[in-house]
């Protein structure tokens, strides 16, 4: 029997609050039905990078000079490798995302740096998928969120070129690829941990906290090109 399918288009609306940035769609994740999960998407090198994340974390902390230790202590569980808790899923919506950079940069930067809050968005897509976009600032990670263990999710994506241009997916430009983990570290508190690429041990750690309810953007419909 022939069935008629009615498709309703729902317009995406954002809150009028000035602090809430626009929501944009990132490029689709590669689809590989034979090998579901993030392992089917990322390179062997990046799989190895995540496998060695505890060692990278330990090396970055050990390299922090004594005079900077108070900055590590001040961040509490955010910089504690074993602080991940169960049920890591991030509810869709707007988040404040604050970057703490852990590691000695090539340009002589301090080994612990904390940056101001910016805005990120976790978006609900088709087939129970989630996407992540950093919407403001200069460093603009974005990608797809994959289930992993009971204490972490995996983000696979790329460093986007500009605010609002989220066209790069993982693998499009390997030099811009990124992988990381999302963990819950407390009530209404998550972190996104991105290990550095290259020889220097270091981490970009984003503290994610939900934007207050009255400042949340109305959730747009799922992107039709989701995998």
Please place each PLM-identified region on the residue numbering.
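Primarily secretory-pathway and cell-envelope proteins
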Residues: 26-43, 122, 128-140, 217-227
């Amino acid at each position: 029997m022939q069935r008629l399918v009615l498709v309703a288009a729902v317009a995406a609306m954002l809150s009028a609050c000035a602090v809430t940035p626009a929501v944009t769609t990132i490029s689709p994740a590669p689809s590989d039905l034979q090998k579901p999960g993030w392992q089917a998407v990322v390179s062997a090198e990046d799989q190895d990078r995540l496998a060695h994340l505890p060692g990278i974390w330990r090396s970055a902390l050990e390299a922090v000079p004594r005079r900077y230790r108070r900055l590590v202590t001040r961040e509490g569980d955010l910089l504690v490798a074993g602080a991940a808790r169960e049920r890591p899923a991030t509810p869709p919506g707007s988040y404040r995302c604050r970057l703490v950079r852990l590691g000695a940069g090539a340009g002589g930067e301090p080994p612990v740096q904390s940056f101001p809050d910016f805005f990120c968005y976790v978006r609900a897509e088709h087939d129970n998928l989630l996407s992540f976009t950093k919407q403001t600032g200069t460093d603009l990670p974005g990608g797809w969120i994959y289930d992993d263990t009971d204490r972490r999710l995996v983000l696979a994506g790329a460093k986007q070129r500009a605010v609002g241009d989220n066209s790069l997916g993982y693998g499009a430009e390997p030099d811009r690829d990124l992988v990381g983990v999302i963990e819950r570290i407390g009530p209404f508190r998550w972190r996104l941990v991105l290990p550095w690429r290259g020889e220097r041990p270091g981490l970009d750690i984003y503290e994610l906290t939900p934007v207050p309810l009255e400042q949340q953007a109305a959730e747009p419909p799922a992107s039709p090109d989701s995998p």
